[in-house]
C-alpha cells in the first residue's frame, strides 16, 4: 500500500458545550501526547472559540469554525470569514449536512463559500454525503460526485492544497449506524478516483479524505486501515475523552 498523507482528526462540537463540560475536555486534550504525525482540529461553537483558543495550548491542535459566510455587513446572526481571520482562526468546516438540510445551503452556496475561504487563506474541511433515501436508491455516487464537482468548478488547482474532504453518510450521523469499513472505503476511493481523473495524480495523492459518520474509539482503528481513509470528522465522541483514542487510531 502506498504511504498515506498526514492524517487529520477533527472534532465538530456542533451546538454543544458549556464551560463545565469543555474545560475538563480541553485539559484532557492538552495532556495528550501522540507518537505519530497527526494534525488535530477542534471546531467549537462561535461563542466558545475564544475560550477554547485561550485554553487549548497543545501545539498539535488547531481551532476551526463550523461555518462562515463570505461577506461582512448586514447579515444578522452570521459570522464572516474576515471576522474569523481577526480572531486568528485558520480552519473552517463548510457544507456540513446539517447546514445543507436545516439552512438550505445548496451545492452552489457551499462551493462559493469554499472558494472564498481558500482565497482568504483558510484551510477548509468540505463535507459531502448522501441520505439514506439516496443510498437506498443507488444514488450515492451521483450525489457525492455532484457535490464534489460543484466545489471543483470554483477552485484553482493551487487551492486544493487547502482543501480536506469529509465524507459523512447522512444516514450514519448521530444515528448510531456506521458505514462498514468497506462501504466507507468504496466512497472514499470513488472520490479520490474522480479527483485523479479531473485534477491529476498529484492532487489526488495529497488530498486528505476524512470519514465522518458515528466514529467512535471502537471503530476508528478498523476504519483507518482502509487505504483511502485519511482521518476522521468526529461529532458526539469528540465531546468525550474518547476523542484522544480516536486520534491515536490514525496511525
Curated annotation (Swiss-Prot):
Active site: 96, 168
Pathway: Carbohydrate biosynthesis; gluconeogenesis; Carbohydrate degradation; glycolysis; D-glyceraldehyde 3-phosphate from glycerone phosphate: step 1/1
Coiled-coil intervals, chain numbering: none
Record's subcellular location: Glycosome
EC number annotated for this UniProt entry: 5.3.1.1
Residues engaged in binding substrate: 12, 14
Family annotation (SUPFAM superfamilies): Triosephosphate isomerase (TIM) (SSF51351)
Any single Gene Ontology cellular-component annotation: cytosol
Annotated CDD domains: TIM (cd00311)
InterPro entries reported in the protein's UniProt record: Aldolase_TIM, TIM_sf, TrioseP_Isoase_bac/euk, Triosephosphate_isomerase, Triosephosphate_isomerase_AS
Chief subcellular location: other
Subunit field text: Homodimer.
HAMAP family: TIM_B (MF_00147_B)
Stated family: Belongs to the triosephosphate isomerase family.
Name by which UniProt lists this protein: Triosephosphate isomerase, glycosomal
Species of provenance: Trypanosoma cruzi
Amino acid at each position: 500500500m502506498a504511504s498515506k498523507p498526514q492524517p487529520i482528526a477533527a472534532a465538530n462540537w456542533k451546538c454543544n458545550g458549556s464551560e463545565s463540560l469543555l474545560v475538563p475536555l480541553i485539559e484532557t486534550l492538552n495532556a495528550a501526547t501522540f507518537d505519530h504525525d497527526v494534525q488535530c482540529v477542534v471546531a467549537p461553537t462561535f461563542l466558545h472559540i475564544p475560550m477554547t483558543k485561550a485554553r487549548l495550548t497543545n501545539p498539535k491542535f488547531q481551532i476551526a469554525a463550523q461555518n462562515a459566510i463570505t461577506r461582512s455587513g448586514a447579515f444578522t446572526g452570521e459570522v464572516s470569514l474576515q471576522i474569523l481571520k481577526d480572531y486568528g482562526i485558520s480552519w473552517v468546516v463548510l457544507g456540513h449536512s446539517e447546514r445543507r438540510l436545516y439552512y438550505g445551503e445548496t451545492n452552489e452556496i457551499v462551493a462559493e463559500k469554499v472558494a472564498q475561504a481558500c482565497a482568504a487563506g483558510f484551510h477548509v474541511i468540505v463535507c459531502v454525503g448522501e441520505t439514506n433515501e439516496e443510498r437506498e436508491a443507488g444514488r450515492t455516487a451521483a450525489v457525492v460526485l455532484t457535490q464534489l464537482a460543484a466545489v471543483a468548478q470554483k477552485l484553482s488547482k493551487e487551492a486544493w492544497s487547502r482543501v480536506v474532504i469529509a465524507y459523512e453518510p447522512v444516514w450514519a450521523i448521530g444515528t448510531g449506524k456506521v458505514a462498514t469499513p468497506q462501504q466507507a472505503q468504496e466512497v472514499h476511493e470513488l472520490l479520490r478516483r474522480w479527483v485523479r481523473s479531473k485534477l491529476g495524480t498529484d492532487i489526488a495523492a495529497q488530498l486528505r479524505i476524512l470519514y465522518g459518520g458515528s466514529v467512535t474509539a471502537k471503530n476508528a482503528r478498523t476504519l483507518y486501515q482502509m487505504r483511502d481513509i485519511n482521518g476522521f470528522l468526529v461529532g458526539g465522541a469528540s465531546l468525550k475523552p474518547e476523542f484522544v483514542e480516536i486520534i491515536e487510531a490514525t496511525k
